[in-house]
Amino acid sequence: MTNRHKKEYYNEGGCGLEIEFAVEYEPRCRVYIGTGLQKLKDFVGSRGKFTTDPSIGSFLNVEIVLRPFPRDELHEIFSGIVDILSFYENFKFTDHCGVHATFRAEADLKKAFYEILTDGRYDSSRFRHNKYKADFMKTATASSGRLRSYEEYITYQEKVGTKYCGVNFLKAHLVEIRTLNLDWDDVTFFYDAYEEAEARIAAQTAQ
C-alpha cells in the first residue's frame, strides 16, 4: 500500500528504511558491478524493493526500500546491506545519498515523538547535511529563538516543503526521518525515541 507521498508499507508497524547509493560505472568493471547488484537483490529478496532516484546524480542511482521490521530483524538486514555496499568499490554513499527511516504513527504518537526529539536530546550530527535542510532543530525553532510547538511545526513544514525538513510528519499516519548517515547507531537513536513515544502514549491511555 502507498500513500500520496509514495511511501510503501506505511500501515505496518516497526521501522522501514530507504537506503540510497550511487554506482560509478566503468566498462571494465561491468561484471563486477553486476555481481554486486545481484548480491544485493538476492540478499534483500522479498523484504524490500529497488527503485531509481535521479536526485543522487550518478550514472546509476539506486534506492533500496525496505518494509518495516522490528529492531533486531532490521539490524540484520541493514548490516548485510552495508557489508555488500562496503565491499564493492564502485558502490558509493555520496553527499547526495542518505538513509531515510519511516514509522507509522497516529496524531498523538507524532506529537509525543516531536516533543521527545525537541527536549534537548536531538543530535544534528546524525544527519548528512547535504542539499536538503536536514537540521531538525533549526526547522523546529522560530526566528525569535522560541521552540515551535508541534502544531506550529506542522504548519511550518507544510509551508516550506516537507521533503526538505529533517523530520517530516506526513499525512496518512507516517513519520519520516531523512538523510541519516549509513550508521546503525543513528537508526537506533530514532528507534529509541519512537518507542519512548509509544510508551508515553500507552501510559497516558492507561491513566
Question: Where would I find each of the regions flagged by the language model?
Answer:
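C-terminal accessory/tail domains of diverse enzymes
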Residues: 1-94, 106-207
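Short, conserved phosphate-binding/catalytic loop or strand-edge motifs used
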Residues: 97-99
